[in-house]
Design a protein with these regions (language model features):
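Nucleic-acid substrate recognition interfaces
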Residues: 1-344
Length: 344
């Protein structure tokens, strides 16, 4: 399984100029190679010597590989040839090093290639991974005014468990996730009300900024909200998988992603929250973390999971947060969904 870790760079003012220049020249060279390939209807054979650009040879070679990959994929899928715009530069794993406090890679300085150490926040976890795993490419990108180093590495998934318990997980708005295991354990994850209040603050701030026509500030606020949402999903998915491991779970059952928005229970005032929160992202976070632990993830049909009584099969509508069936069964409505997913 391929995983990408991120490192926040802390370049000096002079180094930010170098990074901006390098990233712009990188995408310009890739676009130039693609333009040539389109015009001649064939991918040209180029070397770092024949590619004219103020970039280190390693970066030129990577530019050619990227252009070749884009050109081949575009022909294969018969799609429109893209034009790269987002600043980025990529180094292969032989041309960079990571150490405590910095990331070093070649840059073109004063008309010559110089391996440059850029100050960075490098967590111990990243150093441990670098020492024990084969690293892939280094990708430098810019998000707002921040420079991020993205490093890919391969890790083996744990062998799939052949025996163990089953966990059903229901995703929602008021309660982000509820998990029920076949050994009788139930747990609620996240705080939907707190999430809603937090996102209302983001929306109110953007409304004020909109009236002041501060477009850059609006975009910054939106990006900050998205990062916060992703962080919440990471924490919830980690907690779910940790509990699955603790309960010897071999299979986690989730709702099919295509129907989750239709089946989710919500009021009109929660419609915005429903359609802006990414159930897909949370499900995928659970899936990849579970895969690393050797836990299988299965998707089930979500139809009527919030209405069917697991005891008698009768369909009922919950009253507020309580679900009561005429057969005598009663439970929390969010837990009901997880129970029905578990037994689906």
């Amino acid at each position: 399984m391929k995983i990408t870790m991120q490192i926040k760079l802390q370049p000096t003012k002079e180094e930010t100029v170098l990074l901006d220049f390098t990233m712009q020249e990188y995408i310009s060279l890739v676009n130039d190679i693609l333009d040539y390939a389109i015009a001649s209807d064939i991918m040209p054979k180029l070397t770092s010597k024949t590619m004219i650009a103020p970039l280190p040879s390693a970066l030129k070679a990577q530019c050619y590989m990227d252009a070749k990959s884009i050109y081949g994929n575009t022909l294969k899928h018969k799609s429109r040839m893209p034009v790269l715009k987002k600043p980025v530069a990529i180094w292969n794993n032989q041309n960079y090093t990571i150490d405590d406090g910095y990331v070093a890679f070649p840059l073109f300085v004063n008309n010559k290639t110089t391996k440059t150490k850029i100050s960075a926040v490098v967590p111990q976890r990243v150093l441990d991974i670098a020492a024990t795993h084969k690293l892939g490419t280094l990708r430098i990108t810019k998000k707002g005014n921040k420079y991020i180093a993205q490093i890919a590495y391969e890790t083996a998934e744990s062998a799939a468990k052949t025996s163990g318990n089953v966990m059903g997980v229901d995703l929602g708005i008021k309660c982000p996730a509820v998990a029920v295991t076949n050994n009788g354990k139930t747990k609620f994850y996240g705080n939907g009300r707190q999430n809603k209040q937090k996102r209302r603050k983001f929306a109110a701030k953007r409304k004020r900024l909109g009236k002041a026509k501060k477009l850059k500030a609006i975009k910054k606020s939106h990006n900050k909200e998205q990062r916060w949402m992703a962080d919440q999903d990471h924490k919830i998915s980690r907690a779910i998988v940790n509990d699955a491991i603790a309960n010897d779970v071999k299979t986690i059952k989730l709702e099919e992603l295509s129907g989750i928005r239709q089946s989710a229970r919500t009021s009109r005032k929660n419609n915005h929250s429903l359609h802006s929160w990414s159930f897909y992202r949370l499900a995928k976070f659970i899936e990849y973390k579970a895969g690393l632990a050797g836990i299988e993830v299965v998707y089930v049909n979500p139809a009527y999971t919030s209405q069917i009584c697991p005891c008698c099969g009768k369909r009922n509508h919950a009253n507020d947060r309580n679900y009561v069936c005429s057969c005598g069964y009663h439970t929390h409505r969010d837990r009901l969904g997880a129970v029905n997913i578990l037994t689906a």
